[in-house]
Amino acid sequence: MAPLPGAELVQTPLQLYRYLLRCCRQLPTKGIQEHYKHAVRQSFQVHSDEDNSERIQQIIKRAIEDADWIMNKYRKQN
């Protein structure tokens, strides 16, 4: 299950970036939101020079799985 509707539509790094920032808005506190926004920005910068489309799709899939795990973690705590 994806953290937000529309995860299956994510095809490009920019779409992934926007999707993950929207996920961050769903987190419970401002501090947690800022922490994960920073992590998203850092990861985007680290992988910005990636040009292998297969690798990009792997990154997108893994990022959505990680976002799902994080969202479930904070849903269980509340």
Curated annotation (Swiss-Prot):
CDD domains: Complex1_LYR_LYRM9. InterPro entries: Complex1_LYR_dom, Complex1_LYR_LYRM9, Complex_I_LYR. It holds the Pfam family Complex1_LYR. PANTHER family: LYR MOTIF-CONTAINING PROTEIN 9. Belongs to the complex I LYR family. LYRM9 subfamily. This is LYR motif-containing protein 9. The lineage of its organism: Eukaryota, Metazoa, Chordata, Craniata, Vertebrata.
